[in-house]
Regions:
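Mg2+/Mn2+-dependent nuclease catalytic core
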Residues: 15, 19-51, 192-295
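Metal-dependent nuclease catalytic regions and adjoining charged, substrate-binding loops involved
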Residues: 38-45, 64, 68-82, 169-177, ...
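Helix N-terminus capping/helix-initiation residues
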Residues: 81, 203, 238, 259, ...
Length: 391
């Protein structure tokens, strides 16, 4: 392996790309193979590439006068949140279009979401050694989230509130046990001196950004907390949660040079006792490649929306493209009706309302793009100038 490269697409051919490498000291034209012999097939990326597209070539080899990367990242300055990519991996199928649906729908206030926020507060308190009683923890949480708690319909009934508190108290006990035993005895981490809480990462190399729940200071141990259920049928991690950890591991490996074999990544399902809820996640390269392809599709679609608008996409919105036939009962009973309701709002709107929405969405998409990658006519504009500036 010879390293990582930033390249610009010059020409697109059937089995290779002609690109220009912009790495300092390596400025030259070079061929980039779209397929190799070791399962690296990037032909699905070709429809999204145009002349002058920017690519990051990750973990790249030089073979027979051509570059062969392990991963390709489209427009890497356009950072996509790790959770955005992970949420496209559903039990009914993997589809990058879930990003569009999730972005356009209002964010619901549910007891599950509130429980997740409360569990995060509990983990923070346990790591700092507060050992708070549940009533004290609950009071602090409700004081800081009064509006969300008041407007949550599921907490309007006595039964709903009772179930919420029973679940929350159980999770507090599980988290306390995990910090006092698994974290210290099994992982050999001191809660105060050896860990970072909710560190934020910007990874230009992979075109990703994210915030981990817990990370050791030597970057070798990462723990992501989930207050919801694991896949109780298989007793394994939910697919979207697994993908989230795959991407966090990739950020630590490719961006911070931590070897996969030296890394420990865990999903902490605080709904269950630590003996059953703390799951170790290993790197699966097929998952990682698929996740980066989903990330590239999200970027390509966002860039298209910023120039051409969203109208054509919504006019040809295909619900069946969201599923590959898996979990047919879940699809027909829940996912499909939800998508029909989503697109129905747009299709039943007046022509003037749709026209206004389309124009406003295009404006927002353009502003989002400029905020990310900047304006060519204005030096050091956009968030990407933080790593692209020449000073």
């Amino acid at each position: 392996f010879v390293g990582d490269f930033r390249v610009v697409v010059l020409e697109k051919h059937e089995d290779y790309l002609l690109v220009f490498c912009v790495n300092e000291g390596l400025e030259q034209k070079v061929r980039l193979r779209s397929t190799t012999d070791d399962k690296n097939d990037f032909t699905a990326l070709l429809p999204f590439l145009e002349k002058d597209s920017n690519l990051n070539l990750v973990d790249t080899r030089w073979v027979d006068e051509a570059l062969e990367p392990t991963l390709i990242v489209l427009e890497p300055d356009y950072l996509i949140p790790v959770t955005t990519v992970a949420n496209c991996f559903q039990a009914t199928g993997v589809c990058s279009q879930y990003d569009v649906v999730n972005r356009l729908q209002p964010v619901p206030v549910t007891s599950a979401i509130l429980l997740g926020h409360l569990a995060g507060q509990m983990l923070d308190e346990e790591l700092h050694g507060y050992e708070s009683s549940y009533p004290d923890t609950a009071r602090r949480f409700f004081a800081q989230n009064a509006v969300q708690c008041y407007t949550c319909a599921e907490l309007a009934s006595n039964e709903g509130r009772r179930d919420f508190h029973i679940n929350a108290q159980s999770q507090q006990l599980h988290l306390r046990s995990m910090v006092q035993h698994q974290l210290r005895n099994d992982l050999h981490l001191n809660a105060l001196s050896d860990v970072l809480l909710e560190p934020t990462f910007f990874c230009e190399l992979l075109g990703l950004q994210g915030r981990m729940d817990l990370l050791s200071r030597d970057f070798t141990t990462v723990i992501e907390q989930k207050s919801g259920k694991m896949d109780e049928w298989t007793r394994r991690a939910q697919l979207s949660h697994n993908i989230q950890l795959q991407l966090y591991r990739a950020i630590l490996h490719f961006n911070h040079k931590v070897r996969f074999n030296d890394m420990r990544a865990y999903l902490l399902y605080s709904k269950y006792s630590p003996e059953h809820g703390l799951m170790r996640i290993e790197t699966i390269m097929d998952y990682l490649r698929e996740a980066l392809q989903i990330r590239n599709e999200i970027v390509a679609r966002e860039l298209l929306f910023s120039t051409e608008g969203i109208a054509d996409y919504l006019d040809h919105f295909d619900i069946d493209s969201f599923t590959d036939g898996r979990a047919s009962k879940l699809w027909s009973s829940y996912k499909r009706p939800a998508l029909e309701s989503f697109i129905g709002v747009y299709r039943q709107s007046s022509e003037s309302a749709r026209s206004y929405f389309n124009r406003f969405h295009r404006f927002l998409s353009l502003e989002r793009r400029l905020g990310m990658v900047g304006n060519q006519q204005r030096e050091c504009s956009g968030f990407a100038s933080a790593w692209n500036a020449t000073f």
